[in-house]
Amino acid sequence: MTNKVYLLTDEQSKKIEHVLPTSDTTNLPQGTKYRTKISGHTVTLYNSNKLMIQGADSEVIGEQILSKAGIQLTQQLPDSNSTSKHNVSIESIQYDNYNCIGSDEAGSGDYFGPMTVVASYVSKKNAEILKVLGVMDSKNLKDRQIIELAEQIIPIIPHSLLVLDNIKYNERKQMGWSQVKMKAVLHNEAIKNVLNKIEEPVDYIVIDQFAVQGVYENYALGAIPERNKTKFETKGESKAIAIAASSIIARYAFVKHFEQIIKETGISITKGAGAKVDVEAAKIIKLRGIDYLDTITKKDFKNREKALKLIKK
């Protein structure tokens, strides 16, 4: 059995519904809009506007359906059982033209401070507003810009901020969790929270990729909401403004926690995990002790061991 998958627009999806045979639409799998049988082939239309035909002559049946609906496609997804990429053109999704949830995190590469994860819902209308406000890849923005921008967009967009503080981070590390697992759990939970906050239908959920989809789903510790609409994008901040917005809010939250550590310790600390961080950690050990240091840092980083060695010199 072969599978043929076509990526449709909203308008094309509606046309397909009109030409498909009537079928019972109760008890459909999550994310499925319509399912029927044609000439022994299973035809499934998803909420994500993907049309999948399963059967021996899936391509023939697919072309018949498209022709009947008056649709000519230049883009289609490859056969699910084929590794060939010849004669196939994959459409690059313009996420900002859709209602999207995007998620990203901050702090995962920093010895000091928590890990923050944010999911945000950005409608097509708000995407334009965020662009006017200057939302962009947060890696190109300084902390002051992040704070100013975050405080403008937080009231505008539905979002969920989750903070994994250092104590909880270290506890999960002791339980054998990797950072990838922590991220998967937090991203999935934040996305669920946002879905519960909004009433509008979501076209896509796009995650700034930190793991392949199979690994993400294995680690997420729960059902993946709107799985068929979920996409993973490398350098996602530059591809979806929903991810860029989440990145800004996540960095904003991280910066605020980072500033609180500086206030508590009276020591100017540095982001990242470089040699300067080792020296700063050693100063904190001298002032407050290793137990205190562990409450504001990620214990699994090598900076801890290096700081202890500096103390002994």
UniProtKB/Swiss-Prot annotation:
UniProt-listed Enzyme Commission number(s): 3.1.26.4
CC annotations in GO: cytoplasm; ribonuclease H2 complex
Catalytic reaction equation(s): Endonucleolytic cleavage to 5'-phosphomonoester
Cross-referenced CDD domains: RNase_HII_bacteria_HIII_like, RNAse_HIII_N
Listed Gene3D superfamilies: Ribonuclease H-like superfamily/Ribonuclease H (3.30.420.10), TATA-Binding Protein (3.30.310.10)
Biological role: Endonuclease that specifically degrades the RNA of RNA-DNA hybrids.
Protein name: Ribonuclease HIII
Source organism of the structure: Macrococcus caseolyticus (strain JCSC5402) (Macrococcoides caseolyticum)
